[in-house]
A protein has these predicted regions:
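Gly/Ser/Thr-rich active-site cleft segment
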Residues: 9-11, 120-233, 329, 359
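Active-site nucleophile and cofactor-binding loops and adjacent substrate-binding regions
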Residues: 45, 72-77, 96-99, 123-131, ...
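ATP-dependent carbohydrate kinase catalytic cores
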Residues: 180-281, 398-399, 404
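Short glycine-aspartate micro-motif
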Residues: 2-8, 16, 70-75, 153, ...
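Phosphate/pyrophosphate-binding loops at sites that engage ATP/ADP/AMP, CoA/4′-phosphopantetheine
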Residues: 54-71, 142-147, 194-205, 373-386
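Glycine/Thr-rich phosphate-binding loops that ligate phosphate moieties of nucleotide
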Residues: 1-30, 38, 75-108, 112, ...
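Conserved phosphate-binding loops in N-terminal lobes of ATP-dependent enzymes
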Residues: 15, 58-61, 65-72, 136-137, ...
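N-terminal phosphate-binding loop and adjacent alpha-helix
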Residues: 29-68
Length: 474
């Protein structure tokens, strides 16, 4: 039985799925944790840890399966991370990850050089601290010795696939989806923007520094006789796993929050809210990302001295709007809106509020921020009137599903697959081998329908926006 392997190399762990090539049936899974990445605003790790985790996860997935034939493999990785390699192909320093916001001053410096509208027009996005281009600037500015040693840079999924191909002198490749999150590759032109890169360092030969961008179904090498796909970013793989169609919306609640939709044309948003990403098929994936999602639920469950299930039950015991209590959930700064130094605010608390209201306000604060992102995507001309899918750990919560349905005033779907990113990577592996996308994908079910009125949901979202503007001016 030919098997394809989908790998999800995320911030916290590596997940591996083995699936039947023809049916997509799940054969087995494996998982391995990554080391802690440090305290905000720093988030770094040694890239070699990803390879170790992959080996461990694969060993778990293939235990007692000696007859399994691997046909193809592909990797989806956390976006935006910066891996630096020297002339001998050794790691120069720990990789700076997407949620490392130390480069916030560099993001502003980059914008100041040309202006937000210029950046949006050139690369589809305005730099924020998460983007790779700002991390390049940070290392050049604060670690000149490391910068001078660096001869190649790549993204996390690029590094892992390069190692699977044998590392060393093997070619480094990336894909258009993950490349579009760097801040120096244009989804509109399908090329690196060297004018952008020269803002960071005009003396470097960038043509030899960056990975080649592979086409969506290109075979980029072999591993144990299995074809290697080009890989992609985690959000792009999520869209593949769902089989996202025009009009559909995906809202992912993990450590970070994302909302995205597919588009036939590239987008650019000078306000910096919407990142004009490419997807993994040849189309586009406008996306909004927030830094604070399920960790807000974890924190407030701890504050309220309850577990996550009890936290959800508390939230459902309150009403839509949490009796006018608003949480601005920026625990460790925020990416959208761009507030890297912000901290969370609980606005409007009075003696009549209960634990139920605090729990509800926490969930509503996270969801309101993501729905504001959906509005921004819609303003870019993208159709968002289709199905609404909730993904990630937050989607396992009945309260999160119900509150999202209430605030968006639409039914919401959840997927019947727990590892949608790994599934998407497996679909890409299968398509790379056969030359066409497989018919198998995640199935879904309706998780919640709105029970609050449109008036209540509108008022709740307007209170959130007003509190944000009053406290942060955005």
């Amino acid at each position: 039985m030919p098997v394809v392997i989908g790998v999800d190399s995320s911030t916290q762990s590596t997940k591996v799925e083995l699936r039947d090539l023809d049916s997509g049936e799940l054969v087995s899974t494996g998982r391995a944790a990554h080391p802690d990445t440090g305290a905000a605003p720093l988030s770094e790790t040694n890239p070699t840890e990803w390879l170790k985790a992959f080996d461990t996860a694969l060993e778990s997935a293939t235990a007692n399966k000696t007859q399994t034939k691997f046909a193809a493999i592909s990797v989806a990785g956390q976006q935006h991370g910066l891996v630096t390699l020297d002339r001998e192909n050794n790691v120069v320093r720990n990789a700076k990850l997407w949620n490392d916001t130390q480069s916030a001053p560099d993001a502003q410096w980059c914008i100041d050089q040309r202006g937000a509208a210029w950046w949006a027009e050139h690369v589809g996005s305005v730099p924020v601290a998460s983007f790779t281009v700002t991390k390049l600037s940070w290392i050049k500015r604060l670690e000149p010795q490391n910068w001078s040693r660096t001869t190649r840079v790549c993204l996390p999924h690029d590094y892992l696939l390069w190692q699977l191909r044998g590392g060393g002198t093997k070619e480094m490749t990336t894909d258009r989806g993950d490349a579009s999150g760097t801040g120096y590759w244009s989804a509109k032109t399908n090329e690196y923007d060297y004018e952008v890169l020269e803002i960071v360092d005009s003396n470097r030969d960038w043509s030899t520094t960056l990975p080649r961008v592979a086409s969506p179904l290109e075979q980029t090498g072999t591993w144990r006789d299995a074809v290697i796909g080009c890989g992609t970013g985690d959000n792009m793989a999520g869209a593949l796993g769902i089989g996202l169609q025009p009009g559909d919306v995906a809202i992912s609640l993990g450590t970070s929050g994302t909302v995205y939709a597919v588009s036939a044309t590239p987008t650019n948003d000078p306000s910096a809210a919407v990142a004009g990403f490419a997807d993994a098929t040849g189309a586009y994936l406008p996306l909004v990302c927030t830094l604070n999602a399920t960790k807000v639920f974890d924190k407030f469950a701890s504050v309220l001295n309850c577990d996550l299930q009890q936290f959800g039950e508390l939230a459902l015991g309150s009403e839509c709007g949490a009796k006018d209590l608003v949480l601005l959930p920026y625990l460790d700064g925020e990416r959208t809106p761009n507030l890297p130094n912000a901290r969370a605010n609980l606005v409007g608390l009075n003696s009549n509020h209960t634990r139920n209201d605090v729990a509800r306000a926490a969930i509503e604060g996270v969801v309101c921020g993501l729905l504001d992102g959906l509005t921004a995507i819609n303003k870019c001309g993208v159709n968002t009137n289709g199905r609404v899918f909730l993904l990630g750990g937050g989607a396992q919560s009945k309260a999160v599903c119900q509150i999202t349905a209430d605030l968006i005033n639409r039914e919401v779907y959840v997927l019947n697959e727990p590892e949608i990113v790994a599934l998407g990577a497996a679909r890409q592996a299968a398509a790379t081998l056969t030359g066409k996308w497989p018919s198998w994908r995640a199935t879904s079910k309706i998780a919640a329908q709105p029970i609050s009125t449109a008036t209540q949901s509108t008022a709740t979202r307007e209170r959130f926006a007003a509190a944000r503007f009053k406290n942060f001016g955005v």
